[in-house]
Amino acid sequence: MSEPIDLSQIAPTLKAEILAEALPYIRRYHGKTVVIKYGGNAMTEERLKQGFARDVILLKLVGINPVIVHGGGPQIDQALKKIGKAGTFIQGMRVTDEETMEVVEWVLGGEVQQDIVTLINHFGGHAVGLTGKDGGLIHARKLLMPDRDNPGQYIDIGQVGEVEAINPAVVKALQDDAFIPVISPIGFGEDGLSYNINADLVAGKLATVLNAEKLLMMTNIPGVMDKDGNLLTDLSAREIDALFEDGTISGGMLPKISSALDAAKSGVKSVHIVDGRIEHSVLLEILTEQPFGTMIRSH
């Protein structure tokens, strides 16, 4: 892993050069929306959490509109463990029975979201927390998980949903009033049930609906890796399909890369998978020329 960037050790002239390098990117993204899927170590290590909060505040201050969609898998696992319940995953998706759904809502919409909002506000930003149930933001339907061993059959994984529709009005209203939206990936269905939705899928759909200029997905690895552990810096749709087919992309990376590719195909101009373990990874990707992570292309 790259060493964290310690800005206190950078000479003033170099700091000026860094700011000058950022200027064309600030101009490019000024007034534009950037959707950030926030997760992994960046959500659990205090140094990285504080760095992320400062990053999104800086983006807002220079006229870029960050929208945060957060995960919370480790926190959900810890909460389930406390009640003696093990987490189960199928194809990267958490099996969510009624009891697990109650835990998911409490952890994501309460503990995790409020931690993010509080930290951003502590450092001088203005963040507002939402779940997909607020303002009719995320309409969900039950996810039918295809059974790979039995074509035409589906696996019931409980109250796991997929995005049926997004009403972005509440997000746009917050942006217009200079707030930073922080969204928990919980949707509501026509059946009256709450649904646990993979945060990567929500981030991709939201980026599309908001006509975002950029979608960033933070993870705990440098980006998409080949079978020899080498970083793949640029992937086309055809190359991604091949990596799905040979099993290079698997587990929790499946929904992440699928969502990233769908967003790219739907018109999001820039889609990147970035290493959230590196301090200030958001700023490095958006405001510098530094090649960073994996770029996902639709063609």
Swiss-Prot record:
Q: What HAMAP family does UniProt report for this protein, alphabetically?
A: ArgB (MF_00082)
| Annotated InterPro entries | AceGlu_kinase-like_sf (IPR036393), AcgluKinase_fam (IPR004662), ArgB (IPR037528), Asp/Glu/Uridylate_kinase (IPR001048), NAGK-C (IPR041727)
UniProt name for this protein: Acetylglutamate kinase
UniProt KW keywords: Amino-acid biosynthesis, Arginine biosynthesis, ATP-binding, Cytoplasm, Kinase, Nucleotide-binding, Transferase
Q: Which GO terms describe its molecular function?
A: acetylglutamate kinase activity; ATP binding
Q: What NCBIfam families does UniProt report for this protein, alphabetically?
A: argB (TIGR00761)
Give the organism the record lists: Burkholderia ambifaria (strain MC40-6)
Instruction: Look up the coiled coil feature and give its residue ranges.
Output: none
Kindly tell me the pathway this chain contributes to.
Amino-acid biosynthesis; L-arginine biosynthesis; N(2)-acetyl-L-ornithine from L-glutamate: step 2/4
Q: Which residues bind substrate?
A: 72-73, 94, 196
Site positions per UniProt: Transition state stabilizer: 37, 256
* GO BP, sorted A to Z: arginine biosynthetic process via ornithine; L-arginine biosynthetic process
Q: Name one Pfam family in it.
A: AA_kinase
Catalysed conversion reaction: N-acetyl-L-glutamate + ATP = N-acetyl-L-glutamyl 5-phosphate + ADP
Gene3D superfamilies according to UniProt:
Acetylglutamate kinase-like (3.40.1160.10)
Q: Which cell locations does it reside in?
A: Cytoplasm
Family recorded in the similarity comment = Belongs to the acetylglutamate kinase family. ArgB subfamily.
Please give the function described in this protein's UniProt entry: Catalyzes the ATP-dependent phosphorylation of N-acetyl-L-glutamate.
Give the EC number(s) listed in the UniProt record: 2.7.2.8
A single Gene Ontology CC annotation of this entry is: cytoplasm
